[in-house]
Amino acid sequence: MAPPSAPLLEQAPGEVGPTRRRGRRPRALKFADVAVYFSSEEWGRLRPAQRTLYRDVMRETYGLLGALGCAGPKPALITWLERNTDDWEPAALDPQEYRRWVTFQRKTRTRQKNEEKEVFPPKDVPRKGKRGRKPSKPRLIARQTSGGPICPDCGCTFPDLPALESHKCAQNLKKPYPCPDCGRRFSYPSLLVSHRRAHSGECPYVCDQCGKRFSQRKNLSQHQVIHTGEKPYHCPDCGRCFRRSRSLANHRTTHTGEKPHQCPSCGRRFAYPSLLAIHQRTHTGEKPYTCLECSRRFRQRTALVIHQRIHTGEKPYPCPDCERRFSSSSRLVSHRRVHSGERPYACEHCEARFSQRSTLLQHQLLHTGEKPYPCPDCGRAFRRSGSLAIHRSTHTEEKLHACDDCGRRFAYPSLLASHRRVHSGERPYACDLCSKRFAQWSHLAQHQLLHTGEKPFPCLECGRCFRQRWSLAVHKCCPNTHNGSPRPLIGGPNQRSSAL
């Protein structure tokens, strides 16, 4: 037996021998073989530093392949990375996924063109030039300016419902990430994650100055301007300054008066589509924001934030005059009128003025005689819901809050707090004119009528006005007051005869 012409090489199991590679040229290395791709969800989870590192590595890799002569045509991924944008684009997909996406977009555009031809037949539009040329653009301009259904997302107006549905399909392709709670759609998953915090109540961003928490970083940045006092946005018409650009934009509509977005249900007009969308919830009854503590639902996120402070006990707005704290800025503004004496709400019947609109509405019930709060137990009616709540405690006899000093019990903690000032001698409400102090705000309000001369309780029969409600009641019960029979006192005829 002849010896072999060449020595046999020992091979490890699974190793390809040199005879198998003979006659084959190695395949050239491509950028797609070494590149790393991200879906929109994966890209949204990357931190800014990770995205910067990814851009540098991919560019360096493509440059090395070019030095080896293996670069080929510039990939769509490199073109996207060279723009240094943080917004995800389909170019970041795997090449096979990217080709499928391009095919899907091409079919979608073809379907939309066919639908537009059905909605807007081009028979009345003149054609010029070559055969098969598309109709001219004035037809599409009329599509946006004519009246009809309104898109709740962008505020555009369409001639009919099919055109609106076609527009919504295009919007859904641009914003493929819907919110499972309210249906609002977003272009990127990071925006959806940030939006869902409005429903869950999650607030990961904390203010260093006051400890207030926010669901978005930009809201924290806007809030921190409150501590610095900076108002960088100036109105060019009146010079007024604002902390937010959105507040300036809303303010400028007071100068122009422009409100192009109309509610199809009631005809009310708004300056922005977002305000129109919030308003339409009053017609639909939609309340997309839910409190996780008590399951109460709200139409606006700001209302949910203010409500949640009831559970947390947070009161971030202190009064600089008496150090009392409030859960919302509107309640602080209303409270400060107690110290300033400002009363912007006037009664059109008796010229009495009030610091709060709710107090004016309650006062006007004296003129109308309306008592809209009836007791379901005895049928007695009251002008105020608070008076009804206090009255109902007489039926249930449930008084859970006891005074530590005298043992007297109360149905509500506010009544207990007011009563305890009798023992402590605390008088937190001071008159600005004579410095006299009172334990209850209602006593201060009655005292201030002596300085202003105001008499907010009118007699409906003779027109005479009184400073206090009980003075009006005594006036009505006096004999021959209105040239008629005297009205009985509250205690009945026996008490009245004994008093005489």
Curated annotation (Swiss-Prot):
KRAB domain: which residues? 29-100
Sorted alphabetically, the keyword list is: DNA-binding, Isopeptide bond, Metal-binding, Nucleus, Repeat, Transcription, Transcription regulation, Ubl conjugation, Zinc, Zinc-finger
Is Transcription regulation included in the keywords of this UniProt record? yes
The covalently linked position for Glycyl lysine isopeptide (Lys-Gly) (interchain with G-Cter in SUMO2), per the record, is K455
Region ranges (Disordered)? 1-24, 110-144
For this protein, the record's Pfam families field holds: KRAB (PF01352), zf-C2H2 (PF00096)
Q: Where in the cell is it found?
A: Nucleus
| Chain intervals with Basic residues compositional bias | 128-137
Q: Which GO cellular component terms are attached?
A: cytoplasm; nucleus
Q: Where is the composition biased (Basic and acidic residues)?
A: 112-127
**Record SUPFAM superfamilies:** beta-beta-alpha zinc fingers, KRAB domain (Kruppel-associated box)
In the record, biological process GO terms are: regulation of transcription by RNA polymerase II; skeletal muscle cell differentiation
In the record, what terms sit under GO molecular function? DNA-binding transcription factor activity, RNA polymerase II-specific; histone binding; RNA polymerase II cis-regulatory region sequence-specific DNA binding; zinc ion binding
Q: Where are the zinc fingers (C2H2-type)?
A: 149-171, 177-199, 205-227, 233-255, 261-283, 289-311, 317-339, 345-367, 373-395, 401-423, 429-451, 457-482
Record family assignment: Belongs to the krueppel C2H2-type zinc-finger protein family.
| Function field | May be involved in transcriptional regulation.
The name this protein carries in UniProt is: Zinc finger protein 689
